[in-house]
Swiss-Prot record:
Outcome recorded upon mutating P114S: In strain: ECOR 52
Gene null: resulting phenotype: Deletion mutant is shorter than wild type and shows abnormal localization of ZipA, an essential protein of cell division. Deletion mutant is sensitive to low osmolarity. Disruption confers resistance to cellular contact-dependent growth inhibition (CDI) CdiA of E.coli strain 869, but not to a series of other CdiA toxins tested.
Originating organism: Escherichia coli (strain K12)
Protein name: Inner membrane-spanning protein YciB
Presence of keyword Transmembrane: yes
Listed InterPro entries: YciB
Amino acid sequence: MKQFLDFLPLVVFFAFYKIYDIYAATAALIVATAIVLIYSWVRFRKVEKMALITFVLVVVFGGLTLFFHNDEFIKWKVTVIYALFAGALLVSQWVMKKPLIQRMLGKELTLPQPVWSKLNLAWAVFFILCGLANIYIAFWLPQNIWVNFKVFGLTALTLIFTLLSGIYIYRHMPQEDKS
């Protein structure tokens, strides 16, 4: 259910873009993200930090897009979110000395410290590369290609990287946890 809720604003954005334009899609994205946030609060009595940060960035960059009638702002939102995620992962590893991935999954999984560090670093690099790819596609290719990349390309890349991470985790799990 949570994954569906996380994906819903993206589906709404895509549908409104195909039916109307980038500005209607941006307004719909803001509304859909707000609805998902409110629903999460009412249903689960909690809102995850990542969801809240994403909502704030959607409102800020989406609002700027609508106010200035300039789609560059909503295009930058994707890269800013990925940069923040990468930054949080790197800071957690190098400054706080405990990888964020380990903080998120450490209660459910037992892995050696070097595995946590490599996994954390891999996700940071993944987010940096996605942010850079977004910049290239958003500002050097037509808008419709960027929308398709944002909705389908980044989603597919994230799913593939999640699967690869799962395989990496499984290979390094203690034998008793694998059964």
